[in-house]
Amino acid sequence: MTDYRTQPINQKNADFVEQVADRIEEMQLEGRSLWQDAKRRFFRNKAAVASLIILAFIIIFITVAPWFFPFTYEDTDWNMMSAAPTMEGYHFFGTDASGRDLLVRTAIGGRISLLVGIAGAFISVTIGTIYGAISGYVGGKTDMLMMRFLEILSSFPFMFFVILLVTLFGQNIFLIFIAIGAIAWLGLARIVRGQTLSLKNKEFVEAAIVCGVPRRQIILKHIIPNVLGLVAVYASLEVPGLILFESFLSFLGLGTQEPMSSWGALLSDGAAQMEVSPWLLIFPAFFLCLTLFCFNFIGDGLRDALDPKDR
């Protein structure tokens, strides 16, 4: 026999469960909408999208271009030394004083420069984010000691550090990674620390503390995910600075070693022969400047897309 008194209650329970499910779905959608909104705003930025497309073509060029030519970055064409750009011999960007093809060397140099920029940014972002989050969340004497250590590193003469590494270990591309990674994370660590100081007083962090969640999990699962937007913007703006810095080191002769090259080293060689062989300076400078502009516009687009004031 059916108990009709239970039908309204069961119906209410069903309605309540349905409402809860709808609310959970809405909350999930709201959680995703932050990044979806940022994505939509980014792709509405024409300069950022155009820069992203151009940068993709540059990456494709430096990746596949050397495969389509019958010589490497160190091969010498004795019959085409200091040759201007020509279709003859497939030297579309010309050759240098040693008869080496500039197009292939520009592509290989682009690989080195982009690798230094992206790898250096990854190292600095990883160290800076973790260091800043720990310092800001733990606080107290630990925070004070970590910030004093940061100030000591910031006051250290960076060029002296690079020259010391080169003197002790010789010119090596890995030394550039070490040198850049040793100093580039300092600024981000301060920024992440400031964000962490404001985040650790939020309700969701306090709730995690009340539930007995360990500090490490709070930092990794609650603090760091909430600063990823800031970190992404910082990384996109850090890459061009690191590329430019590597080019500066190579221009001074402290970067890549012959016959390997980078855009900075090519600029140094081109500047020395600018009057007689201007193409040696024009092509590397064009790719370097174009890449720097692309990264800057992409960084500006990310910053605008993730800016909560504009939502």
UniProtKB/Swiss-Prot annotation:
Major location category of this protein: membrane
Membrane topology: Multi-pass membrane protein
Pfam families, per database record: BPD_transp_1, OppC_N
Alphabetized CDD domains for the sequence: TM_PBP2
GO biological process: protein transport
Any one annotated GO CC term: plasma membrane
The organism's place on the tree of life at top rank: Bacteria
Ranges of residues in domain ABC transmembrane type-1: 110-299
Key word DNA repair present: no
Periplasmic side: 70-113, 170-172, 244-278
Record's keyword terms, sorted: Cell inner membrane, Cell membrane, Membrane, Peptide transport, Protein transport, Transmembrane, Transmembrane helix, Transport
Residues annotated as transmembrane: 49-69, 114-134, 147-169, 173-192, 223-243, 279-299
Location in the cell: Cell inner membrane
GO molecular function: peptidoglycan peptide transmembrane transporter activity
Residue intervals annotated with topology Cytoplasmic: 1-48, 135-146, 193-222, 300-311
The protein's assembly and partners: The complex is composed of two ATP-binding proteins (OppD and OppF), two transmembrane proteins (OppB and OppC) and a solute-binding protein (OppA).
Function according to Swiss-Prot or TrEMBL: Part of the ABC transporter complex OppABCDF involved in the uptake of oligopeptides. Probably responsible for the translocation of the substrate across the membrane.
Assigned protein family: Belongs to the binding-protein-dependent transport system permease family. OppBC subfamily.
Annotated protein name in UniProt: Oligopeptide transport system permease protein OppC
The species this protein was found in: Haemophilus influenzae (strain ATCC 51907 / DSM 11121 / KW20 / Rd)
Originating gene: oppC
